[in-house]
Amino acid sequence: MAKYLGPKLKLSRREGTDLFLKSGVRAIESKCKIDHLPGQHGSRRSRLSDYGIQLREKQKLRRMYVILERQFKKYYKKAVRMKGNTGENLLILLESRLDNVVYRMGFGSTRLESRQLISHKSIIINKKVINIPSYQIKPNDCIEVKEIAKKQSRIKAAIEISEQREKQSWIDVDRVKMQGIFKKFPDRSDLSSEINEHLIIELYSK
């Protein structure tokens, strides 16, 4: 599957917000001018049309979870078929991806690193090795680092870094044992207020 190989900070600058594509050891504001577009002569942002605003919001969410357009649209279509609010359903589907849950639990310093751990068969779900980053986690699933992988320095470093991040109420984590429980799907109030999912739904509904 194709993936973006360029500078991660450039994507955050493009969207005007921290997409959490880097480890977070240093605040993104200290690494780049987040309010300027990327490029040597990056200028301040011009006024966008309604379509442009919707598109930027979609790109921001898609890049935050490191997902390509084709897969992102599949999540939208699945969210439409689910009961309840389509926008909230979309966020829940993204938030319950295995690579995101591994990141939230602190076993990977970024979602991309978490995806690598999964692909390398370093993550166990309910006592079974799962190597599919998009695997959908369900309430009460147990996620743990494979015993042989617990010695990896990058996992230990990621756990240390995760102590600086906000704790998530929908997961329980034992960072010493390197395992956690996905207690429930998050409520909308648990997730970032910087995301306006209604704009994304409006974009795809056209």
UniProtKB/Swiss-Prot annotation:
This is Small ribosomal subunit protein uS4. The keyword Signal does not apply. It comes from the Bacteria. NCBIfam families: PRK05327.1, rpsD_bact. Keywords: Ribonucleoprotein, Ribosomal protein, RNA-binding, rRNA-binding. It comes from Wigglesworthia glossinidia brevipalpis. InterPro entries: Ribosomal_uS4, Ribosomal_uS4_bac-type, Ribosomal_uS4_CS, Ribosomal_uS4_N, S4_RNA-bd, S4_RNA-bd_sf. GO terms for biological process: ribosomal small subunit biogenesis; translation. GO terms for molecular function: rRNA binding; structural constituent of ribosome. Residues 96-158 form the S4 RNA-binding domain. SMART domains: Ribosomal_S4, S4. GO terms for cellular component: small ribosomal subunit. Part of the 30S ribosomal subunit. Contacts protein S5. The interaction surface between S4 and S5 is involved in control of translational fidelity. Belongs to the universal ribosomal protein uS4 family. One of the primary rRNA binding proteins, it binds directly to 16S rRNA where it nucleates assembly of the body of the 30S subunit.
